[in-house]
């Protein structure tokens, strides 16, 4: 797999048949396949997944649901979903005409290394811009919205004056290299719930899909605010 | 209570039973529980209550309705509402699985000190940014939109060339300290219908929910405009 | 009348009875009372009529329909509309609990001096900001969108390289003085279909409600673009 | 034809009768006439086709569907559509009261020179602004979103570190001259799927309507990002 966009040369793995519709068709609006479609529309309207960019995955027990590559996010339907068994990494369902998301190994990293319940990847312009201004990490402190972000290494959320630190990894031509550096960042920053990718975007995960969504929203708010602070020459880490 | 976000360690006070559904379930779209849900969606779409931030409360006679902590604002339903008796400060209704908003003592200040009918709290980025540029108060004059803001100490609204002054209080780690300084600001600025909180957001109240909404909207417009004026080096208080 | 916002001291003129409902209640979505409500929602979502600011009026033959003062634009209903006879300036319909828009004499100027079919007034932030950067007139040339603006003094629209000139009048505490200067601007600039009001907003009119809407939209686009050009030091009137 | 806006002096060519309704009336939401209306609403909400500006056309086999001139994009209905035979350039359907889009010869260029399936023209402010900052071409490299853009001259999309180059042509008073320079740009830049028009906007095409939409979205994202990078003094082509 070579990118989060549709890779033309990529062979669709056909371990699961497209007839496994019961895995994704449900009247329950909280079914992962339905939630992915709903959230993709929200993210599209925020400008985070423009032009088929970005991705989202939800885990339910040992099954992970993944939005496909190359489909317009605001037009996603449950029938488009890939379903994978987390342990074996075999596809339980593969839509015949679609290609799996190149984000899949990155989502798997969050599931396996952090026991995440969902993982969101956006091409948010605020995320891209912040990676052009910061070097190894993005840092911000003493903004109330920081309280929405979890400490991860212990229970509870960051305090108002705590410093939020999000590592920035370098983008790569080849997806495999991005997986390696994402895993390294997750190890080096045990307290982070997100990783920025330079000139690319951001990965955010959480214990549940709703927590992942809230973390992503709060982080994007902080990235936007940081850019406005930078424009006025105000440091994002408050000096005392 | 430690923040407007969900405080994990906080004990939910169970003075009222969740069976008191008749307090919040109504076909009337103007019922406070319905209005709170409707307005939360509007505020979410404005980017004012991102990531479960912010809050809103409406008073109807001696009953106050308060949106809970930690619930995504755009997904709020009437069943999520807390109801409190204003005088005794006892909860008349407490949703079992939710925590009361940490904004509650701040909302109570507006109700008790100003006889407000509703109080809105947002994490508007314009509000946060303005508190990074102004010291003790935000001031603006000679903008038509100022006419939407009430004089408070006497009948009627501000005139075009009047100076709108909104006090800025310092944010605190602990909610109790914020309540004290909010009350002090309300006393020191008898003509204000809003208080800015540094690096946090804004509290706005009004005689009715619609007035509070209009004041909040008009103030946010003025805060945004002030930031644009600042960028161009134009003072927000017109010099004659 | 003292402002486009609700003037508390102002006596509602009760020349028409509120029972004249047939003037505003219609199943036809193109009825002026319905169109005003629909367009107010559009303008609200554009941030042009925040906090009850701004106004709109449509003329049908000798009857003019006017949105009331002090009502939230996105919650307007046909029953809120005032109806006036253009020639006598008598109200044909006066909603009992509402106050007529203070914009009324300004709308009348566009109807009487220019035979307009509709007049739109917004508090667009782009309009306000432009009046802080330009002196007597706003000018822009050589932008394709200019072709959406009419020549007024002759048939057809401006050409690409034509110069769009919109006069700027000073805002006033008292509405009457604004009416005078608006009329003067209309006389001095026979080719204009809009007048900017310093630190206040803009008035735009057209032969029909749709033309007024398109002109207002195109002008606001040009005002926004002019602000971006200013930020980059690019003159809005192209130098050859 | 003199502009993308309604040209008053232009004779409507009545080669086809308006009774040819079967060409545009369909229950199928993917019918070109329905898709044009749907996408015009999306583009309007993005601010790309404000004030009747811009245009869109879809080809189905030898028939091309074209949105008319002078109609508000968000209020377009299938009955407004022109239908033309690509080879003969004869109109198969001409709505009686409407004028054909002045973009028609430009759309035809994309169909004939590139075998496009759809062509989108917007007055995006990001497009206009970029043409004020760049000379002969707009260039950007090493941004992940570039991967959404096709190579055109060979299969597949651009790589992350590839340089996206979009030619900029000069705007003209007369439409004919724009057609000539657009065709010249298409010839000179065989790898481009878009052409910017100075002080005017952008033309984007693709093999299908969905590809054209995705390309246009991804390019606009890159144009916006380029403007933000310029503001911070960061070159859009990454230097190694
Ligand atoms: Zn990506
Ligand atoms: Zn708060
Ligand atoms: Zn006004
Ligand atoms: Zn055009």
From Swiss-Prot, chains A, B, C, D:
It catalyses: 5-(methylsulfanyl)-D-ribulose 1-phosphate = 5-methylsulfanyl-2,3-dioxopentyl phosphate + H2O. It is an enzyme of class 4 (lyase). Keywords: Amino-acid biosynthesis, Cytoplasm, Lyase, Metal-binding, Methionine biosynthesis, Zinc. It comes from the Eukaryota. Its EC number is 4.2.1.109. It is found in: Cytoplasm. Binds 1 zinc ion per subunit. Its cofactor is Zn(2+). InterPro entries: Aldolase_II/adducin_N, Aldolase_II/adducin_N_sf, MethylthioRu-1-P_deHdtase_MtnB, Salvage_MtnB_euk. Pathway: Amino-acid biosynthesis; L-methionine biosynthesis via salvage pathway; L-methionine from S-methyl-5-thio-alpha-D-ribose 1-phosphate: step 2/6. GO terms for molecular function: methylthioribulose 1-phosphate dehydratase activity; zinc ion binding. GO terms for cellular component: cytoplasm. Substrate binds at residue 103. GO terms for biological process: L-methionine salvage from methylthioadenosine. The active site is at residue 144. Zn(2+) binds at residues 121, 123, 200. Belongs to the aldolase class II family. MtnB subfamily. Catalyzes the dehydration of methylthioribulose-1-phosphate (MTRu-1-P) into 2,3-diketo-5-methylthiopentyl-1-phosphate (DK-MTP-1-P). This is Methylthioribulose-1-phosphate dehydratase.
